[in-house]
């Protein structure tokens, strides 16, 4: 059973609404389905380091082995929780994470926002009801953590900026920066850019990523002296 992989990116491709990478790990090529957000970052060269790390959910079937890759452990285990719901398959699980962030889905489950959940491709009214019914109790503590992180630690109420910062955190994790380092850079960026109040419309993910990496690399350089 494969649970985690670190290797060199060989190729990316898209088949309908499925997004894939081929990773070379010690001479073996692993075909892995990934989320659209990470796929787009790779395709637009927003991630210069082509050696990537993914958390893997390995699903065995009679005629095939399927690998689903995520840039954080949280994404992987959220995906697993989604698959625990009756009638929800792997592609529905990927559609959910392609459409919304973890915090947005958890909030929708908590508030029983069926309209938002039904906007996800492949999910109708009955499946929306099942997702809310079967996941609401599981994510009770997780909701509190997400809300605390979004309001008290980061103080971001704008959903677009929150999603931007969440994507930044996941990307830095995939580039092998330590969680301790990442936790220090996020408040710095928020304070430096005045994100909660300015809500900058022209702020790009690439600029944020470069600023974060430069700051982290500078900090590591100072520690090495």
UniProtKB/Swiss-Prot annotation:
Function, as annotated, reads: The RuvA-RuvB-RuvC complex processes Holliday junction (HJ) DNA during genetic recombination and DNA repair, while the RuvA-RuvB complex plays an important role in the rescue of blocked DNA replication forks via replication fork reversal (RFR). RuvA specifically binds to HJ cruciform DNA, conferring on it an open structure. The RuvB hexamer acts as an ATP-dependent pump, pulling dsDNA into and through the RuvAB complex. HJ branch migration allows RuvC to scan DNA until it finds its consensus sequence, where it cleaves and resolves the cruciform DNA.
Q: Give yes or no: UniProt keyword S-adenosyl-L-methionine.
A: no
Single GO biological process annotation from the record: DNA repair
Q: Where is this region: Domain II?
A: 72-150
Cellular localization per UniProt: Cytoplasm
Q: Does the keyword Magnesium apply?
A: no
| Source taxon at top rank | Bacteria
Q: Name one GO molecular function term.
A: ATP binding
Query: In the UniProt entry, what is the domain comment?
Result: Has three domains with a flexible linker between the domains II and III and assumes an 'L' shape. Domain III is highly mobile and contacts RuvB.
Which family is annotated? Belongs to the RuvA family.
Q: Which organism is it from?
A: Prochlorococcus marinus (strain MIT 9215)
Which Gene Ontology cellular component annotation is one that this UniProt entry carries? Holliday junction resolvase complex
List the protein's name: Holliday junction branch migration complex subunit RuvA
Q: Could you give the subunit structure recorded for this chain? A: Homotetramer. Forms an RuvA(8)-RuvB(12)-Holliday junction (HJ) complex. HJ DNA is sandwiched between 2 RuvA tetramers; dsDNA enters through RuvA and exits via RuvB. An RuvB hexamer assembles on each DNA strand where it exits the tetramer. Each RuvB hexamer is contacted by two RuvA subunits (via domain III) on 2 adjacent RuvB subunits; this complex drives branch migration. In the full resolvosome a probable DNA-RuvA(4)-RuvB(12)-RuvC(2) complex forms which resolves the HJ.
Q: Where is this region: Flexible linker?
A: 151-161
